[in-house]
């Protein structure tokens, strides 16, 4: 097989730098202006941490942050559990009656517009409230259910791709030695797909934290998430507190992302060492 020649051109570096600049320059400007002492977000008036203090004293903003983080963590956890079960059914159970319909229902939220999803869930909750009296009020619970609905699809796709790459001979060898399918899953399969589960959890957490459209449909008067509060604030003018909040979120995402990358890299190295040790043994 002939390998195609690698074209080394300085333009590749230029294009790469332009791409990174386009992606990260706005974030850098946001971080810089979060330390601006002026009330006008576009006018520089000197360095100050004033808006971080104002942010911490803003009860409405802190309440929205707490609500969004709680919903995102709970939705990501539920989506990780349901997505793992769905992925195992899709990959390990093979063809069964209704498998195509099951796969379609799992992946449908990936291509469904948020407006349609939000409106359909709103109609569902209203119909349930009239039929059985639940939910009596729309709020944190309805937002959580809505987020689990679409986050599960993303988690299932991530874990399914990982399951298809696994060497099934390891699982078959364990069952030949007398292990039950349930024990094989928890002792062998689950540790091997754990990096994918963590990735799916982080993806679901990000999607839930970032959602505005669906939450706007299914939320109630007493439940205002962070994207909803930020959107309403921006419509009346950009508040410098938003720059400070965005900077804190960027820092938190960077730290969590690094920790997740480190844990997954260490788990992957350990998995490779275990496989090599088993083959030598």
From Swiss-Prot:
Principal place of residence: membrane
UniProt entry keywords in alphabetical sequence: Cell inner membrane, Cell membrane, Membrane, Transmembrane, Transmembrane helix, Transport
PROSITE patterns with a match to the protein in the record: ABC_TM1 (PS50928)
Periplasmic face of the membrane: 34-68, 136-140, 207-243
A Pfam entry, by short name: BPD_transp_1
Activity regulation information from UniProt: Transport is feedback inhibited by intracellular polyamines.
SUPFAM superfamilies linked: MetI-like
Transmembrane regions: 14-33, 69-88, 116-135, 141-160, 187-206, 244-263
A cellular component term, taken from the record's GO annotations: plasma membrane
Cytoplasmic side: 1-13, 89-115, 161-186, 264-281
Domain ABC transmembrane type-1: from-to ranges: 65-260
Protein's cellular compartments: Cell inner membrane
The keyword Membrane is assigned to this record: yes
Membrane topology qualifier: Multi-pass membrane protein
GO biological process: one example: transmembrane transport
Function: Part of the ABC transporter complex PotFGHI involved in putrescine uptake. Responsible for the translocation of the substrate across the membrane. Imports putrescine for maintenance of the optimal concentration of polyamines necessary for cell growth in the presence of glucose.
Similarity comment: family membership: Belongs to the binding-protein-dependent transport system permease family. CysTW subfamily.
Quaternary structure note: The complex is composed of two ATP-binding proteins (PotG), two transmembrane proteins (PotH and PotI) and a solute-binding protein (PotF).
Protein name, as recorded: Putrescine transport system permease protein PotI
Organism expressing this protein natively: Escherichia coli (strain K12)
Phylogenetic classification of the source organism: Bacteria, Pseudomonadati, Pseudomonadota, Gammaproteobacteria, Enterobacterales
Gene name as annotated: potI
């Amino acid at each position: 097989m002939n390998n195609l020649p690698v074209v080394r051109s300085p333009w590749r570096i230029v294009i790469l730098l332009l791409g990174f600049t386009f992606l990260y320059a706005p974030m850098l400007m946001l971080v810089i202006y979060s330390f601006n002492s002026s009330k006008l977000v576009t006018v520089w008036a000197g360095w100050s941490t004033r808006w971080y203090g104002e942010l911490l004293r803003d009860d409405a903003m802190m309440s929205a942050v707490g609500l969004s983080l709680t919903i995102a963590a709970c939705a990501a956890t539920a989506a990780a559990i349901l997505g793992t079960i769905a992925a195992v059914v899709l990959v390990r159970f093979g063809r069964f009656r209704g498998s195509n319909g099951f796969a379609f229902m799992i992946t449908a939220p990936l291509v469904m517009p948020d407006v349609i999803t939000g409106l359909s869930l709103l109609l569902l909750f209203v119909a349930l409230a009239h039929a059985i009296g639940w939910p009596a009020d729309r709020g944190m619970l309805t937002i959580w259910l809505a987020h689990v609905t679409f986050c599960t699809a993303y988690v299932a796709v991530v874990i399914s791709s990982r399951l298809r790459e696994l060497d099934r001979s390891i699982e078959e060898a364990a069952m030949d030695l007398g292990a039950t399918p349930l024990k094989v899953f928890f002792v062998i399969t689950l540790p091997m797909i754990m990096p994918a589960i963590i990735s799916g959890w982080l993806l679901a957490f990000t999607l839930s934290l970032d959602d505005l459209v669906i939450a706007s449909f299914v939320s109630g008067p007493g439940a205002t998430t962070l994207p909803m509060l930020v959107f309403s604030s921006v419509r009346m003018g950009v508040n410098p507190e938003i720059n400070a909040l965005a900077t804190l979120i960027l820092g938190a995402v960077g730290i969590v992302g690094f920790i997740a990358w480190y844990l997954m890299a260490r788990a992957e190295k350990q998995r490779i060492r275990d496989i090599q040790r088993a083959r030598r043994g």
